[in-house]
């Protein structure tokens, strides 16, 4: 019985130690989530308005073309799938959900495909299954900046402009809130500009210095902005999922500690009762 009590005490100490870790991780990711969520909320309206502006300019300037807008029709196009995952685990179903979506997309795709991974978890998953990414990015950190997104995208654009890939699709996780994140897929290249609304359909624009120069600046900036937003969405989703997972783990640890404490108290009570019974039995034997 003494050994049983000691074993329960060891388990209580172990669970309490784990609970301290999960609680600390929850607090850290809660702070990171607030910063990431603010970035997402700031980026969304900018991306939306930039898409509308680009759509109006392209629709108004008929005949204007740009390499990032041009859809290649010759031959069988090669599609690059860009997968955004985390470098670390302990984030609930965040990684496996988006990886599953990427795996399904690759299996359903009838055209030749190439894989680009951002995050260690996605890379490791596909490398283990003999699918080697043509580009991989790991250890990018938690502070996603526009400069970082542009640096990553430039390497992807190089593949596109060189003709190695003809279409780029991104599989990422859309941030809804701390407990809800949705794996999604969108086409990044060639750019599909938003349709202009009726109020702007017949507006004539004056370009300075020229339509070509304006689009040469605006089109790459649009691609960079969209990719930056997707990276922010993914990072905010990661922090939200990890904060929720660590919160659940902390609560589960609390329940386990309560059950173990109850088991310990029962074992101690049983030991005390047995000792009292032995004392009473010994006293009765002496009196007899």
From Swiss-Prot:
Q: How does it sit in the membrane?
A: Peripheral membrane protein
UniProt-listed GO biological process terms: proton motive force-driven plasma membrane ATP synthesis
Q: CDD domains under this entry?
A: F1-ATPase_gamma
Example of a GO cellular component annotation carried by this entry: plasma membrane
Classify the main location: membrane
**PROSITE patterns from the UniProt entry:** ATPASE_GAMMA
Sorted UniProt keywords: ATP synthesis, Cell membrane, CF(1), Hydrogen ion transport, Ion transport, Membrane, Transport
Q: Where in the cell is it found?
A: Cell membrane
Q: List the molecular function annotations (GO) for this entry.
A: ATP binding; proton-transporting ATP synthase activity, rotational mechanism
From which domain of life does this come? Bacteria
The similarity comment for this entry is: Belongs to the ATPase gamma chain family.
What is its biological role? Produces ATP from ADP in the presence of a proton gradient across the membrane. The gamma chain is believed to be important in regulating ATPase activity and the flow of protons through the CF(0) complex.
Please describe the quaternary structure of this protein.
F-type ATPases have 2 components, CF(1) - the catalytic core - and CF(0) - the membrane proton channel. CF(1) has five subunits: alpha(3), beta(3), gamma(1), delta(1), epsilon(1). CF(0) has three main subunits: a, b and c.
The identity of this protein, by name, is ATP synthase gamma chain
């Amino acid at each position: 019985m003494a050994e049983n009590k000691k074993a329960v005490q060891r388990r209580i100490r172990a669970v309490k130690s784990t609970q301290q870790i999960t609680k600390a991780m929850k607090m850290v990711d809660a702070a990171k989530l607030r910063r990431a969520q603010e970035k997402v909320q700031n980026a969304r309206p900018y991306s939306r308005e930039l898409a509308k502006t680009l759509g109006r300019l392209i629709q108004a300037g008929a005949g204007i073309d740009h390499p990032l807008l041009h859809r290649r029709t010759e031959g069988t196009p090669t599609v690059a799938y860009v997968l955004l995952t985390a470098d670390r685990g302990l984030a609930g179903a965040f990684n496996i959900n988006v990886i599953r979506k990427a795996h399904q997309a690759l299996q359903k795709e009838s055209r030749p495909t190439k894989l680009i991974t951002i995050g260690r978890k996605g890379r490791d998953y596909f490398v283990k299954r003999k699918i080697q990414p043509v580009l991989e990015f790991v250890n990018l950190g938690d502070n996603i900046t526009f400069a970082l997104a542009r640096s990553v995208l430039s390497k992807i654009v190089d593949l596109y402009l060189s003709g190695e890939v003809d279409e780029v699709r991104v599989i990422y996780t859309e941030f809804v809130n701390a407990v809800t994140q949705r794996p999604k897929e969108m086409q990044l290249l060639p750019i599909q500009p938003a349709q202009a609304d009726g109020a702007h359909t017949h507006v004539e624009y004056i370009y300075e210095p020229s339509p070509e120069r304006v689009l040469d600046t605006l089109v790459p900036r649009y691609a960079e902005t969209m990719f930056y937003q997707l990276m922010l969405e993914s990072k905010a989703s990661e922090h939200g999922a990890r904060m929720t997972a660590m919160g659940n783990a902390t609560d589960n640890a609390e329940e386990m500690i309560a059950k173990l404490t109850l088991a310990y108290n029962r074992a101690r009570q049983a030991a005390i009762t047995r000792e009292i019974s032995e004392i009473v039995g010994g006293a009765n034997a002496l009196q007899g």
